[in-house]
């Protein structure tokens, strides 16, 4: 997987390693869908969609969480397990309830602990992994202190988030059926793993989270009495969700599992999408290209199909061939930053000096609209290096290092940029900002190291 990701140019499924050491998956189509799904819920909650967002985490577990700020983190496993976009909206609404409620997450040594909020408790997770004895042990009285320590949201906070989520769903005019059906899935899963038991040691009221079955009963009245309960689902969102779900399955899952789930006889858009990724991961570029060509033939103006076509060409050693579909995908997607950064990478990969100006233009546009793309900064730095612009090469390196948490490189590169840029210019001020933040972080690291050595 890492070998493949090293080749990816950030427009398709791009990995970013945050401080919490969890992998964030970035994809233009997926992010657009999640933002469209969450937008009415953010508005209903009184949050600005410009300042709030949903981030996808590479993790097969069924989970979502908040960790400070106005960001909802959703695991890829939740997308895989959901039957509809409406179910995911129910989970997002619940998470927004935590944000609006100001529910603090557990902090340990200055770092946030990611919290499971869907009642898949530690014991259930252990049982699901095949360790029944370990799961039972976690649920014993002697382990309750550990559960209480590492699961930060209290039962009251969970119930409060449920109530707030139901309110936001109803206010947004979205059916609450998905919220209830997803909680029903969780209840069934807990039954399957033997969580519900007559064992007196397993006291539902002693758990940090309320039980899913109790939460469903509490939610029913609020959701079922709302005018939007029987409102038809947004079919545009549902169709897009099935596409994204298939794309993620093709990208994340074992190719054998993907091909079993979407056999060649299945000629749906979702199946072509999933198989294209599965074949691409498996090192079969011709089969991957054939699946992608079927998608482009069906919808020749779909930017995400064109993006995939260009990506496969690029990674198959044909960067020149990749430019046309990626250029069209960028235009059709209103210059989506992640797609534009892939176009910039393809232009660079031709090693043709005639393409440097266009590469610089599209990459600068990409980072201007999305500053959280380290690969785009890497490519932009390469453009500057090939043009002999040492100052901006150093600044781009500082930007990327700062984003990746590489304090030492950010500090040195920002100093180098400041030394070469006109003092007071916009780029010089930006280099100074990075330098000041990096210097503070560097000093704190040295102080901490000194305390540990005492």
Predicted feature locations:
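Extracytoplasmic and endomembrane cell-envelope/extracellular-matrix remodeling and assembly machinery
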Residues: 26-28, 32, 54, 149, ...
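Canonical tetratricopeptide repeat
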Residues: 274, 308, 342-343, 379, ...
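Catalytic Zn2+-binding segment of zinc metalloproteases
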Residues: 96-113, 129
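Helix-start (N-cap) detector for alpha-helical repeat units in TPR-like alpha-solenoids
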Residues: 269, 303-304, 320, 337-338, ...
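Residue at a conserved register position within TPR or TPR-like alpha-solenoid repeats
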Residues: 279, 313, 347-350, 384, ...
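Alpha-helical linker/edge segments of TPR/alpha-solenoid repeat scaffolds
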Residues: 192-193, 317-320, 352-356, 387-395, ...
């Amino acid at each position: 997987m890492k070998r493949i990701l090293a080749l990816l140019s950030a427009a398709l499924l791009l990995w970013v390693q945050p401080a919490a050491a969890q992998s964030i998956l970035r994809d233009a189509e997926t992010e657009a869908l999640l933002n469209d799904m969450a937008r009415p819920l953010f508005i209903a909650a009184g949050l600005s969609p410009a300042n709030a967002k949903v981030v996808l985490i590479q993790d097969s577990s069924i989970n979502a969480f908040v960790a400070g700020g106005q960001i909802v983190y959703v695991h890829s496993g939740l997308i895989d397990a959901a039957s509809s976009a409406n179910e995911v909206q129910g989970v997002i609404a619940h998470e927004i309830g935590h944000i609006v409620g100001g529910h603090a997450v557990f902090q340990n040594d200055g770092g946030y602990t990611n919290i499971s909020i869907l009642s898949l408790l530690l014991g259930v997770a252990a049982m699901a992994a095949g360790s029944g004895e370990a799961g039972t042990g976690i649920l014993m009285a002697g382990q309750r202190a550990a559960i209480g320590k590492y699961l930060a949201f209290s039962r009251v906070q969970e119930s409060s988030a449920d109530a707030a989520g139901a309110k936001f769903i109803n206010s947004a005019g979205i059916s609450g059926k998905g919220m209830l059906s997803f909680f029903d899935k969780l209840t069934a899963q807990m039954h399957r793993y033997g969580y519900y038991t007559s064992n007196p040691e397993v006291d539902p009221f002693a758990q940090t989270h309320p039980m899913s079955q109790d939460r469903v009963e509490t939610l029913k009245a609020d959701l079922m009495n709302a005018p939007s309960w029987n409102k038809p689902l947004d079919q545009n969102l549902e169709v897009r969700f099935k596409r994204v779900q298939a794309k993620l399955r093709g990208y994340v899952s074992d190719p054998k599992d993907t091909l079993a789930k979407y056999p060649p006889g299945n000629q749906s858009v979702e199946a072509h999408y999933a198989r294209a990724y599965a074949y691409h991961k498996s090192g079969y570029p011709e089969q991957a290209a054939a699946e992608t060509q079927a998608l482009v033939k069906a919808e020749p103006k779909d930017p995400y199909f064109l993006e995939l076509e260009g990506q496969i060409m690029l990674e198959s050693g044909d960067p020149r061939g990749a430019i046309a579909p990626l250029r069209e995908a960028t235009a059709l997607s209103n210059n989506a930053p992640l797609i534009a950064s892939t176009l910039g990478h393809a232009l660079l990969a031709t090693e043709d000096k005639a393409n440097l100006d266009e590469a610089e233009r599209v990459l600068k546009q990409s980072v201007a609209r999305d500053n959280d793309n380290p690969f785009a900064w890497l490519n932009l730095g390469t453009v500057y290096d090939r043009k002999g612009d040492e100052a901006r090469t150093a600044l781009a390196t500082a930007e990327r290092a700062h984003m990746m948490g590489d304090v030492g490189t950010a500090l040195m590169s920002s100093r180098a940029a400041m030394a070469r840029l006109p003092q007071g210019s916009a780029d010089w001020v930006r280099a100074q900002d990075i330098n000041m933040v990096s210097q503070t972080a560097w000093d704190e690291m040295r102080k901490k190291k000194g305390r540990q050595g005492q």
